[in-house]
């Protein structure tokens, strides 16, 4: 069988075309061959979310440093070139000070959005906001976990047409069936955190290794 060796740039174009054909319009990885949403150097592809009283945000040593704000602080993706379903979103975060959530993840669920809140409502509530008009402290996804300061945690969200699943490290925290459920963001400033956002509430946090990976249906 005869093989054809294409120049590197032609191979890259061919691979990108195949990937787009497989995933469909609007459902491509952030960069060809890489699931990374954060380059470790600057906020390229992101913007500081315009939260009133938000803390200072800067990139140092391969991490996003979020200073404590009056209420909520964070960043959101500055483009819409992301999957809406059949994907995994993950990030690692550490809380240095404060007593509330330090890596809220806002993400698309089909045509709407939701937020995974680890350590909200005083530091221990874990869950999804919002489901059928109820936030993470009120709906059936609410669980309770103590988050230690000065320790890195890995948070992961998986979205398919039928489910939203979330993990804290390797422990599943949410396993939500979507059929006949009304999914939406909690009304308020978190609505600025789309299409993908990372937030901290009155905490000092650092974020690294933000990744978005399409998964097979």
Roles of regions detected by a PLM:
Residues 15-25:
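Bacterial N-terminal signal peptides
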Residues 4-6, 20, 145:
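A subset of signal/propeptide-processing and intrinsically disordered low-complexity segments
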Residues 27-217:
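Carbohydrate-interacting regions of secretory-pathway proteins
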Residues 2-15:
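Bacterial N-terminal signal peptides that target proteins for export
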């Amino acid at each position: 069988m005869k093989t054809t060796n294409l120049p590197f740039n032609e191979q890259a174009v061919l691979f990108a075309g195949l990937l787009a054909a497989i995933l469909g319009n609007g459902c491509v990885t952030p960069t060809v061959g890489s699931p990374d949403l954060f380059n470790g150097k600057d906020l390229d592809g992101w913007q500081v979310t315009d939260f009133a009283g938000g803390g200072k945000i800067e990139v140092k040593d391969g991490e996003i440093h979020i200073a404590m704000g009056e209420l909520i602080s964070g960043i959101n993706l500055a483009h819409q070139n992301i999957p809406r379903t059949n994907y995994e979103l993950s990030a690692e975060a550490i809380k240095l000070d404060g007593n509330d959530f330090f890596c809220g993840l806002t993400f698309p669920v089909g045509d709407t959005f939701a937020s995974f809140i680890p350590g909200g409502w005083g530091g221990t509530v874990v869950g999804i906001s919002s489901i059928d008009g109820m936030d993470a402290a009120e709906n059936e996804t609410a669980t309770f976990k103590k988050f230690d300061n000065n320790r890195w945690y890995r948070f992961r969200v998986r979205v398919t047409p039928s489910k939203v699943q979330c993990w804290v490290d390797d422990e599943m925290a949410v396993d939500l069936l979507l059929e006949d459920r009304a999914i939406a963001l909690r009304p308020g400033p978190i609505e600025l955190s789309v299409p993908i956002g990372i937030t901290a509430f009155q905490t000092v946090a650092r974020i690294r290794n933000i990744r978005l990976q399409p998964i097979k249906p």
